[in-house]
């Protein structure tokens, strides 16, 4: 939004003829403009891997349905933002690509298929950790295969077990905003 340069969004970057160059240009321009006004953290990139029809809360925000491509483009954004003095925030851990509900309003349950966590959801976040991302934002979704009934934001199994221990992340963890009435599953 003005006075900043507007970009078409991650979905357009991911579908472009030169996604790597566009991701780098987006992050470089964003870092320069944020720095000019004294900002030092961007709540980006979105590292959710699209899994079927993208719902409104993710429309235009995901780099696509290929975990490796999301990881590569996310890494470019992280590297370029942070080289420009802006802390990057990888979000929404451990991934929102399989939900049709807006987790800002209602807590969705994300039912992952066997092996999907490792081969899809964690691929971009593992790359972000390897890239040295400054912060990770958690999602409010519930992942029954990891911690039944507990939103990721409040889950020791997700935050400590998955993010800290399994991925080896030791940086800042922040939560996403939540507008709903209750933080329990199904509410």
Predicted regions, residues:
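Active-site-proximal loop/short-helix segments
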Residues: 2-5, 40-60, 87, 91-107, ...
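Glycine-rich anion/phosphate-binding loops
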Residues: 15-32, 67-72, 115-118
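Active-site cleft segment of glycoside hydrolase catalytic domains centered on the general acid/base Glu
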Residues: 56-70
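A charged helix-plus-loop insertion that forms the helical arch/lid used to bind
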Residues: 2-18, 62-64
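Second-shell residues forming the walls of enzyme active-site clefts
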Residues: 68-187
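Acidic/His-rich segments in extracytoplasmic proteins that coordinate ligands and/or metal ions
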Residues: 3, 20, 36-38
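Acidic-leg catalytic submotif of subtilisin-like serine proteases
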Residues: 29-43
């Amino acid at each position: 939004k003005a006075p900043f340069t507007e970009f078409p969004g991650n979905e357009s970057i991911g579908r472009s003829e030169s996604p790597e160059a566009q991701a780098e240009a987006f992050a470089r321009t964003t870092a320069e403009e944020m720095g000019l006004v004294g900002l030092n953290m961007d709540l980006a990139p979105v590292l959710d891997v699209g899994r079927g029809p993208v719902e409104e809360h993710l429309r235009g925000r995901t780099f696509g349905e290929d975990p490796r491509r999301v990881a590569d483009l996310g890494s470019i954004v992280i590297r370029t933002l942070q080289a420009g003095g802006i802390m990057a925030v990888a979000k929404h851990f451990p991934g929102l690509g399989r939900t049709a509900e807006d987790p800002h309003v209602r807590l969705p349950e994300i039912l992952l298929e066997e092996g999907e966590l490792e081969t899809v959801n964690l691929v971009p976040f593992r790359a972000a950790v390897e890239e040295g991302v400054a912060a990770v934002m958690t999602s409010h979704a519930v992942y029954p295969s990891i911690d039944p009934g507990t939103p990721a934001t409040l889950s020791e199994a997700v935050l400590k077990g998955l993010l800290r221990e399994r991925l080896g992340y030791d940086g800042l963890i922040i939560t996403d905003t939540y507008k709903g009435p209750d933080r329990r599953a199904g509410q």
